Each structure stands twice: as C-alpha cells, then as structure tokens.
C-alpha cells in the first residue's frame, strides 16, 4: 500500500479502483517495449550495514522510517540476497544487497522514473538465466497535499546483482488523481521469475498488480493485471486482466458484468517446477461469506497458466476469510487494526509452490475468526492459517493454524525449504497476553505440526512511535502504519532468511518513542 512522509507527517493516499482490456478474454499481443518517460533519477549507494549478532539492522543511512520488506535469495548462490523496503528518508525504495550470507549489506536508493516521483510497494526478483536482478515498484507523482497521482508500475534492472540499478521500465501506466473523470490507480504489484531449469519458461519474469478504476472518485473495479518478460526485463508483454469471472464465486457487483471477479487486491505469484505459474489474490465479491449485507468478507482465489501467462484459468476458490466490515476494530484512519493498537492490518499472505512436486502449493493468510467478530465492538485474536493443494489448486485442505498461541498473529509470509521440504511461515506475534509489543516469529514444519522460533531478539513497540502517530486520546503515539507485509526466503543451502519491520530502536528525537527499521535474521 502507498504511504508518503513529509517531515514526520504521514499522508495515506486513498486507493481508488483499471479498466479491463474488454471482450471475453485477454487478447494475445506481441511483446512491446515500454520505457519510462523523462529523465531517470539515479540510484545512490548510501552505506554498508554489518551484522552485529543474531539480528541485523539493515537501515544504516538515517533515522527515518522504513517498512514493507521483501527478500529474495539467488537460486544459484545462496549467499547472494537482495532485500528492499519503503524508505521515508528519500525519494525511493531502499535496496539491501549481500554477497556473503548476510554478514554485510550494501544499502542505498533505487532508481525511479524522474525526480518528481516517489517509490512504493517494493519487491525484488533475481533472474538466474539472464544474470539480472529486477526490482518492481509503484512510482507516483505527489501533489502538495500528499495526493498520489499517475502511479506507474515500473521495473528497474540491476546487471551486477543489486549493487547498481538502471533506468526503470514502465510495465503498467497509471492515470490521474482521485477526483479526476477517470483515474487508474495501480497498487500492490508483485514480481517473480521462473528459475526452474526444467521449465519451458525458464527465465520468464512475471509482474502482477491491482488496477483500481474510478470515475470522479467513484469506484468502478479493481481487477488483477499481468505482464511478463523473456529477456531479463528489457521487453514486456501488454498488460492483461487475469482475475477472470465466476458466477458462483463473484456474485456481488459494483459496476461490472455479472460474475466478473473484478474487486480484487494483493496478488502474489509462484511457479511450479513444470513451469505452471499461479497467481493468488483476495476478492471481496462472494456474498455467501457475508454474515450481513455488504460486509465484504474476503475470499482467497487462484488462477493459473500452463503456457507462460498467455492464457489463464478461471479463478478457483481457496479459502474464505473472517475479515469483513465488523470483524476488526477500526483505527483513526478508518482501517482495520488490532485491539489496543492503531497499526493497520489485513489478512493478506502469499502462495508458494513446492520446489520438487508439481501442483503442490501452500497459501497463508490471517483473519479474526477466533476473536470477537461480526460485532459493533470486535476484539481480535487474529491467527495465521495455512491451506494446501496437491492438484494445482482444484482442491484445498481446510485452514489450519500455524501458531497455537492465543494472542494476535498477522502479516504471514511463507516459503518452502528446498533441502528438507518443510514449510516456513514468518509472522508478527503479540504473544498470549496481547500486550503493547510484538516479536517476529518463524514457524517451520508441515501443516498441523510446526515448530516456532522467535527470530527477533527484542520486542517492537508500535504504541510509542516517533512516526505515523495516531494522535488520539489514550493512543497519541500509536503508529497507524508499519507496512503491509514482511519477507521470508530459503536458499539452496537450507537457511531461512527473514526480514521484517522492527520498532525496537529508541528515537534520537523524542525520549520514550521508537523508530521503524528493517531487520534481518538468518536461521
């Protein structure tokens, strides 16, 4: 999600919903080159972060906040890793690159389209076949009042493994501002490369995102879009809508055709060894999940392609979620939060394919089904859940808890250890008492049998934050934002590599308050 910082003030841009290509399905089009207009704002190296123990603070540059970390490990070299985050002390996303297994990290700013733009929603992939790292981001123009306009989806290549970053390529164009006659507000993009050497599409990189279309501020739709590249990110296919339609699963409609699954968010990509690509996303149109009219509980859905993204299956149901309008407390910004907190949360997680077994996938998410929900005064006991399919998404197991504790857990991220086949799930955890602090934990094993390791060596305190303050009685210094996701990736050596948003470091400006940085740990 999009955030922008002016001094220590926060502007949260409103998401408004992209026009589909039209017709009954995506039109097959030739590859085209989409180059960002105007001058490029160059990447900039800032500092080197060194490991000082079990946890490493990757933000060695300044005291301004960072959040939403993602991490990727080079399949051909497990000591080579790249992480990235939102950075509020500069124009751009932050990159963190290590070639020595996390002992040290080169840190700096990503490239963007031009100096008037700001980066957001950072995600990085490594394309082993073409020897290039690819960083996807949203690049917005910000008005003086903090409104985000003309948000493009861009991809920046790095030919040296993440030490320098080239001019970004626009793969999806945004259009307009919130109240314009037509606005296309791109949000929550994701990027992944098929690094399976036996795949027919080895070296193909996929990017997906949500395209929110609105007319004069009125929401119309928000389908999932997709594009792909076969040459290390130099050329990209025309974007196509892939979220599809289902009269059984997508019964509610704001403005679209009956059965169109076009009110979506939070797409994530994974590929199986045989080259099948899967995209999972949340959708809010399944009225059979609503406990009351227009409650908009989400469902997780999945689509797949067996021919490298040229054609896509109809969406299939994965799991229903307890995350509707009356299922969580609401924070000062009108977003869902956790009891006693103000940080916005959601149920989004990710899908990951088994690296050895075609059609075997795991998907993780969180919701409040075990708390007080469907109430005017909801109380959270948010849990992380995992579901599994063995047949490429046709059938899924029932959700099972990853952590058996009774406190809030949220922001899950999963990966599969290629050495032993175990699933790892990283998440934030308040512990059984649901107190003011949280830690970050890693559960490893198999559904129904996980072993938990607390990765963070100190707790984080989002109720006493230097930045993103709620400013309300009883919670004046509570943060309203700490990103929307965290990151986990296993290397071919079997090590787990975790990055998360951490709030342990005291502020140099205000005694008793804490900063927001990206931390790394290896297990």
Predicted regions and their residues:
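Bacterial N-terminal signal peptides
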Residues: 2-13
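C-terminal PAP-associated
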Residues: 19-523
């Amino acid at each position: 999600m999009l955030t922008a910082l002016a001094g220590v003030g926060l502007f949260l841009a409103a998401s408004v919903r992209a026009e589909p290509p039209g017709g009954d399905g995506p039109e097959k089009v030739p590859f085209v080159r989409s180059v960002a207009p105007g001058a490029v704002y160059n990447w900039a190296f800032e500092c080197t972060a060194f490991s000082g123990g079990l946890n490493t603070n990757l933000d060695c540059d300044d005291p301004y906040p960072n959040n939403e970390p993602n991490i990727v490990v080079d399949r051909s070299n497990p000591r080579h890793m790249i992480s990235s985050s939102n950075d509020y002390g500069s124009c751009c996303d932050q990159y963190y690159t290590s070639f020595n297994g996390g002992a040290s990290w080169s840190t700096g700013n990503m490239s963007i389209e031009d100096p008037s733009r700001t980066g957001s929603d950072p995600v990085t992939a490594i394309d082993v076949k073409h020897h290039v790292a690819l960083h996807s981001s949203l690049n917005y123009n910000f008005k003086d009042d903090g409104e985000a306009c003309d948000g493009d989806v861009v991809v920046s290549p790095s030919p040296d493994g993440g030490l320098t970053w080239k001019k970004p390529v626009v793969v999806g164009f945004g259009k307009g501002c919130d109240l314009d006659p037509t606005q296309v507000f791109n949000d929550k993009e994701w990027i992944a490369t098929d690094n399976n050497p036996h795949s027919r599409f080895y070296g193909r990189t996929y990017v997906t995102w949500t395209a929110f279309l609105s007319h004069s501020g009125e929401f119309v739709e928000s389908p999932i879009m997709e594009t792909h590249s076969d040459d290390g990110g130099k050329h990209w296919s025309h974007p196509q809508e892939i979220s599809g339609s289902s009269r059984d699963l997508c019964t509610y409609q704001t403005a679209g055709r009956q059965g169109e699954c076009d009110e979506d968010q939070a797409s994530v990509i994974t590929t199986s060894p045989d080259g099948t690509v899967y995209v999972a996303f949340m959708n809010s149109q399944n009225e059979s999940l609503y406990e009351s009219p227009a409650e908009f509980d989400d469902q997780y859905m999945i689509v797949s392609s067996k021919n490298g993204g040229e054609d896509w299956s109809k969406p299939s149901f994965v799991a229903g979620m307890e995350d509707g309008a009356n299922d969580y407390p609401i924070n000062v910004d009108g977003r869902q939060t956790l009891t006693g907190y103000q940080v916005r949360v959601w149920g989004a997680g990710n899908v990951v394919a088994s690296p050895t077994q075609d059609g075997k996938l795991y998907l993780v998410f969180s919701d409040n089904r075990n708390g007080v929900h469907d109430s005017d005064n909801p109380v959270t006991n948010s849990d992380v859940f995992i579901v599994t399919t063995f047949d490429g998404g046709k059938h899924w197991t029932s959700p099972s808890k990853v952590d058996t504790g009774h406190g809030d857990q949220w922001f899950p991220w999963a990966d599969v250890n290629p050495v032993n086949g175990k699933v790892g799930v990283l998440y934030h955890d308040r512990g059984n008492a649901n107190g003011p602090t949280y830690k970050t934990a890693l559960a490893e094993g198999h559904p129904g049998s996980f072993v938990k390791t607390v990765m963070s060596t100190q707790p984080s305190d989002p109720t006493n934050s230097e930045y993103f303050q709620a400013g309300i009685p009883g919670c004046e210094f509570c943060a309203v934002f700490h990103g929307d996701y965290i990151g986990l990736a296993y290397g071919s050596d079997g090590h787990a590599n975790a990055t998360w948003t951490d709030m342990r470091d005291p502020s140099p400006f205000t005694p008793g308050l804490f900063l927001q940085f990206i931390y790394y740990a290896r297990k």
